[in-house]
């Protein structure tokens, strides 16, 4: 492949980005999409444009909250929980004008590189007037750290068993393209995941770098495990509230505020909200494709024992020396 050949859709974009992208290592993923390797992660050209714009132009505020994750790791749920936590001082969870009843979690907590910075490094963010401002990202920690420019804003990271991530991504990709879930596509995705050549991959390094950051700076980086959010939601929600400096009071706990938020943000409830059944994101994706099962271990219904064994071996090798286990 010619490393200097840039897809036509980038020709009118920022020359600095084009010059940088043309110099990067590249490969192709499961559907032959060309990916470029930047700061240890793989990105398609359009996503990388947004990453570079964000990294160059973002002006963080110390009160900002960034929700970070590898794709399909529980991002939508974490966004909903965070919004509900911060909104509880303003209105009741049952209020008809609660933000979660009026917009999808991804509309309420916009992606930096996938929405706000896709076209420019200086987007108008004045419409995001709330304090703290809520943003989200899938970029690797080393890339995010550079963009934050030493700001002490809060970062909340959620991680999930990569086998469930893979299956969730397969379903999501099929729903987004409005095609059937073909086994051959899952097999190709599996190969890309194992090589690490997948958008935002490799997933293992993505998780490890945020985990290390949470150990080094626990005051500003919170590391949540999706499976623990599922098995002990009350404990993890209170932990999140403490981290965001909005802990539940004794009175709130006694009147059931924790349970109210968990019910409001449950997959069952979010999935059945009118806004999530019929709405679309600004990029044209149906809201409903962000809600499927959310079950722990669903990958066993789709991956062969050999595929599971291979992923387990890679995980053991990648996580050796850490306390991380799926």
UniProtKB/Swiss-Prot annotation:
EC number(s) from the headed UniProt entry: 2.8.2.-
Uppermost EC category: transferase
InterPro entries: P-loop_NTPase, Sulfotransferase_dom
GO MF term set: sulfotransferase activity
Swiss-Prot/TrEMBL keywords: Cytoplasm, Transferase
Name of one Pfam family that matches: Sulfotransfer_1
A single Gene Ontology CC term: cytoplasm
Binding site for 3'-phosphoadenylyl sulfate: 72-77, 160, 168, 226, 292-294
Claim: Transferase is one of the keywords in the record: yes
Coiled coil segments of this chain: none
Principal subcellular localisation of the protein: cytoplasm
Subcellular location, record wording: Cytoplasm
UniProt keyword Nucleotidyltransferase, yes or no: no
Domain of life of the native organism: Eukaryota
Active site (catalytic residues): 138 (proton acceptor)
Family: Belongs to the sulfotransferase 1 family.
Function summary: Sulfotransferase that utilizes 3'-phospho-5'-adenylyl sulfate (PAPS) as sulfonate donor.
UniProt protein name: Cytosolic sulfotransferase 7
Organism classification: Eukaryota, Viridiplantae, Streptophyta, Embryophyta, Tracheophyta
